[in-house]
Amino acid sequence: QYDTDIAWNRLSQLLCQIRDIQQRHNVASAHIVLLGDLISGAPHPVVAMQNREDVVDQVILAGEMLAQFIYNISMLFTNVYVTAVNGNHSRLTPNKKDAIIGERLDRLVTWHATTECKHLPNVSISQPLDGFHGTLDIIEIRGKSYVLDHGDFDQFTEAGVAKLISYLGFVPNAIISAHKHTPAYMEVNSVACVQNGCLSGGGDQFTLEHRLGGKPSQTVCVCSDAGIEVMYPIKLI
């Protein structure tokens, strides 16, 4: 069963893979995009009962892990940029209709980690964009725009992508999302859509019942002036 030791081990595996990719492509800058669900909070009572740590412990541990990961990445790259959106798993109430849209514990995890890392000279922390309440963010890499979106409000389908683009009022180069626990990729009218996996994978009661199972993974994209040049769905054990 997924626990803190497994999480540390998988982050170590991910760091080793990123180091190899950085050397292979001679990359100078890294964008760490936090796509939400950094903890498993209150949205699903069954998941909450299966959690090994309570929510407060999860916030503290996730913040420490993230801070250490950012520090390790800063040792590999000349410049590191950190941007975050919030996920549904960190809301404070099980009923999403009662939840305040921007009230997510992911914000505390990110604040904890980035506060510890703000002294690092080559690490830049992005502030949330006004008007989106932490549900969306937009970054620019080598002149191309990338929309960051957890995915609970926007479906990973052609219709979902079209609706999001209409809402934004512009066509981004790529949309990077998560939410479904498994990596995926598609293109919608030249917009690259990347769905990230998750560190824990599937296997708890909720993901089994809803057929959301997936092996633990994280996705690393190498971006050039043309957009996403290479994509690595990194499997973790």
Segments (PLM) and residue ranges:
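Conserved beta-sheet core of the metallophosphoesterase superfamily
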Residues: 103-107, 115-122, 127-133, 142-236
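Core catalytic region of metal-dependent phosphoesterases/phosphodiesterases
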Residues: 3-119
